[in-house]
C-alpha cells in the first residue's frame, strides 16, 4: 500500500459579509464521500485531513500541514480547496485562507500548493474557486448524489488498482481550475456549477464505467483527471457558464486517475446470448 495524503480545505469567508459561502463545508463533505468510495480511490479516514472548518485559518498553518506531503515518503497527495479565490494584480492565482479583514486578505499563492522544486512529488490540486481580479462569491455545494450503485464495488481491489496507476506515473503535478484566469466561478441554486457538473458526470457514467470494467479481461477501468477536464469543459462551456482549465507541471506519459475501478475477474463474459469465456484470477 502506498503512502497517500489528502487535504480538504474550506473557507466560506466572514459570516457577516454578503459574500459568505456557508455551504463550503457541505461541499467538502461530498468531495470526501466520493474519494472514500471504491472508484474514487478508497481513501482511508486516517489519510484525510480537513482544514479550516469553524476556525480562522492562516497560510502558515496550511504550510505546516503540508510538510508530510512534500517529502519523498509521500507517494501521492491530493489537495482540494472550496471557497474564495482570485487572480492578484501581478497575475498570480491565489486562494483566500482565513476569514479576511480589510487590513489583511491573507492570500496564499496557488504556487505554494504545487510542490515546485520537488521533482519527486506526485500531486493533484483541485481548486473550486474564482480566478477573477478580486475575490467573488461562489457558493460551494454538491447536490446530494446517489453513489449507492457504485459503492457495492470492492474498495480494496479498486484501491490497489488506483495505487498502481499512481506509481506508474512519473512524479508530476496536475492542477484543475474550475474557471479560467480573470473569470468567476459561479454557483447554482444548490451549489457550484463546477462541483455539480463533476458529480453529475460520476452519477451518469458510473454504469458505463462498470460495463467497461466487466468487459475488460483484467476487470480494469480508469478515467483520468484529463478525462474529467474534457467532460467538465464540454458541459460548462456548452452551457456558456465558465471555462475550466487543466495544467500539468512536469513530464509524464501516465496521468493520475480520477476514477479507478477493478472488478473481480472470476466471472463469465457474455457476447449477446453466447457465453464467450470464463475468466479466472
Q: What is the predicted role of each segment?
A:
Residues 1-281:
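Cysteine endopeptidase catalytic domains of the caspase/legumain-like
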Amino acid at each position: 500500500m502506498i503512502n497517500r495524503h489528502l487535504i480538504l480545505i474550506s473557507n466560506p469567508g466572514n459570516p457577516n459579509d454578503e459574500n459568505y459561502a456557508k455551504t463550503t463545508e457541505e461541499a467538502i463533505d461530498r468531495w470526501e464521500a466520493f474519494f472514500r468510495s471504491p472508484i474514487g480511490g478508497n481513501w482511508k479516514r486516517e489519510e484525510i485531513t480537513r482544514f479550516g472548518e469553524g476556525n480562522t485559518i492562516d497560510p502558515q498553518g496550511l504550510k505546516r500541514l503540508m510538510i508530510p506531503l512534500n517529502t519523498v515518503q509521500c507517494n501521492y497527495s491530493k489537495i482540494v480547496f472550496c471557497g474564495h479565490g482570485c487572480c492578484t494584480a501581478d497575475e498570480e492565482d491565489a486562494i483566500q485562507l482565513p476569514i479576511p479583514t480589510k487590513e489583511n486578505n491573507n492570500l496564499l499563492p496557488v504556487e505554494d500548493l504545487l510542490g515546485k522544486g520537488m521533482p519527486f512529488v506526485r500531486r493533484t490540486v483541485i481548486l473550486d474557486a474564482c480566478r477573477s481580479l478580486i475575490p467573488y462569491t461562489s457558493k460551494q455545494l454538491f447536490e446530494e448524489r446517489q453513489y449507492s450503485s457504485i459503492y457495492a464495488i470492492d474498495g480494496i481491489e479498486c484501491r490497489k488498482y488506483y495505487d498502481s496507476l499512481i506509481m506508474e506515473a512519473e512524479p508530476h503535478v496536475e492542477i484543475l481550475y474550475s474557471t479560467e484566469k480573470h473569470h468567476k466561478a459561479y454557483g447554482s441554486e444548490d451549489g457550484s456549477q463546477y462541483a455539480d457538473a463533476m458529480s453529475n458526470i460520476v452519477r451518469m457514467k458510473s454504469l458505463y464505467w462498470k460495463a467497461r470494467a466487466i468487459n475488460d479481461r483484467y476487470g480494469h477501468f480508469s478515467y483520468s483527471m484529463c478525462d474529467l477536464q474534457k467532460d467538465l469543459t464540454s458541459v460548462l462551456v456548452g452551457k456558456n457558464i465558465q471555462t475550466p482549465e487543466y495544467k500539468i507541471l512536469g513530464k509524464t506519459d501516465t496521468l493520475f486517475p480520477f476514477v479507478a475501478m477493478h472488478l473481480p475477474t472470476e466471472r463469465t463474459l457474455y457476447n449477446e446470448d453466447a457465453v464467450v469465456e470464463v475468466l479466472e484470477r
